Amino acid sequence: MSVAQTATSVDGDGNLRRTDVRNIAIIAHVDHGKTSLVDCLIRQSGVFRENQQMQTCLLDSNDLERERGITILAKNIAMMWNGVRINIIDTPGHADFGGEVERVLRMADGALLLVDAFEGPRPQTRFVLQKALQCGLALMVVINKIDRPDCRPDEVLSQTFDLLVELGADDKTLDFPYIYTSAREGYATHDPAQKGGDIRPLLDLVLEKIPGPIVRPDDPLQLMVTSLEWSRYVGRIATGRIAAGRIRTGQQVAVMRSNGAKTMAKVEQVQLYDNLGRSNTAEASA
């Protein structure tokens, strides 16, 4: 029996879904705590051993991003939680990078909408959130910075609901799960009056509320490429999501371009996102 067969189940609509994977995008306005939250998730999920040092602000690695405090090129981070691989996909937050936003969101099945417990939803949040709704992503709201003395989490939750109504969200989306966090203090809670603890309630809610990806493991290979890189050592690197079939080292594949042209290529190497980097694997499947 293949790994794909043992890690799938049929949902209520008859779709075959992976049960051991969650693909989530994080949507947030500048300074609402996205980088701090991801740092916290990585620390507490066991990516690093206790004696390891970790540079903060993991997602803001591009020089321009460090200078301006924004995210332009999305990064992917993978972590394991209770036997499930959680792929975290960071999203550009500005309308200027709309093409990048759409490509990134198509990698995800759900989105964490991160909102400051004092400021509430901001214009930057609105743009990416609208794109996420258009992609049909399952939504989960995270009200962050509840450790602030001036926080107003209940009002901000209501503002978030109103924003979703304005954007035309359906009834299912409006019944979104939500949780409160302090990324700086490292905890999540279902009750904003309850301070302290750890981030585990957030990770548990992700596994419970965000669906695994719909897959077709026995169909011919289909891989949606979302970004291309060039390495002087291995050549062109395509990053994307496998919707159907399998991809193996040494496999001959057809590369379909946007204009309909088709070229043949050989897969020299297959890698998966693994914690903060990538690891080689002989095969990957939908």
Predicted features and spans:
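Conserved catalytic-core segments of large NTP-driven translation/proteostasis enzymes
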Residues: 165-286
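Conserved C-terminal guanine-recognition region of P-loop GTPase G domains, centered on the G4
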Residues: 105, 110-173
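Alpha-helical scaffold segments in soluble metabolic enzymes
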Residues: 36, 40, 103, 127, ...
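N-terminal, positively charged nucleic-acid-binding surface of large information/translation enzymes
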Residues: 63-78, 128, 134, 174-189
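Short beta-alpha junctions and helix-cap segments that line functional grooves
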Residues: 11-12, 61, 75-76, 98-101, ...
